[in-house]
């Protein structure tokens, strides 16, 4: 990644949590920018219009970096989720090579990272057949089923169910993959119509209520 873009990402993360109460008046804006560490090169990168693709790649690098702490990774994740609310950006995950590193984060040791990964996946695939297909291709459905039924963190389980719900609605290949990996007692081996919203809702309601052992 370009050094200026990397520095710009770091600056953005650092200043996204800065209190606004100490902001100077307009006449001191230039000095304040320097004090906060914005270099001319970084400003050039910013106003030169870093593309959404650049920002998505930079965020993913931060999410996998050992040099970025959890708090700032979660900020980067939030920025990433907002970017992929755009269907064009969601469809760019595959050509940018971001599906694999995103799916890998479903198995992160930190519950908040797993939760955000599931949230981003749910956002990307919602009403987006191309992204729904990629979720199947990258074998994320079984991981999401495991998360929704065994993860010890309730918020993480909730986002895993959200991702599954978004993935299977009106997309039969994802629904077939889900049914194949449901725990014992669910509709295993049965054909569930991905276009039947009542049937989809029934499965999701069961997943939300799925008991998780306290030792999980």
Swiss-Prot record:
Compartment list: Cytoplasm
Gene Ontology CC terms, in alphabetical order: cytosol; endoplasmic reticulum
Keyword list, A-Z: Cytoplasm, Repeat, Translation regulation
Disordered as annotated region, ranges: 16-35
Top-level taxon of the source organism: Eukaryota
BP term (GO), one: cytoplasm protein quality control by the ubiquitin-proteasome system
ARM repeats: 27-68, 87-126, 129-169
Keyword ATP-binding on entry: no
MF terms (GO), sorted A to Z: adenyl-nucleotide exchange factor activity
UniProt feature, compositional bias: Polar residues: 16-33
Family in the record: Belongs to the FES1 family.
Protein name, entry field: Hsp70 nucleotide exchange factor fes1
Organism, scientific name: Aspergillus oryzae (strain ATCC 42149 / RIB 40) (Yellow koji mold)
């Amino acid at each position: 990644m370009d050094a200026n873009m990397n520095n710009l990402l770091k600056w953005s993360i650092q200043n996204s949590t800065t209190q606004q109460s100490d902001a100077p008046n307009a006449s001191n804006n230039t000095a304040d920018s320097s004090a906060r560490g914005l270099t001319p090169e970084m400003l050039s990168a910013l106003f030169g219009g870093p593309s959404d693709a650049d920002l998505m790649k930079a965020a993913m690098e931060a999410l996998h970096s050992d040099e970025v702490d959890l708090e700032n990774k979660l900020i980067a994740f939030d920025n990433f989720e907002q970017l992929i609310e755009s269907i064009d950006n969601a469809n760019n995950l595959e050509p940018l090579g971001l599906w694999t590193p995103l799916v890998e984060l479903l198995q992160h040791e930190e519950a908040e990272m797993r939760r955000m990964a599931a949230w981003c996946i749910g956002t990307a695939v919602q009403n987006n057949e191309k992204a729904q297909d990629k979720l199947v291709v990258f074998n994320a459905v079984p991981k999401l089923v495991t998360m929704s039924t065994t993860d010890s963190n309730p918020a993480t389980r909730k986002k895993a169910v959200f991702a599954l719900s978004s993935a299977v609605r009106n997309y039969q290949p994802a629904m077939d993959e889900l049914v194949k990996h449901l725990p014992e007692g669910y509709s295993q081996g049965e054909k569930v119509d991905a276009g039947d919203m009542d049937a989809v809702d029934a499965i999701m309601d069961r997943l939300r209520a799925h008991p998780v052992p306290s030792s999980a």
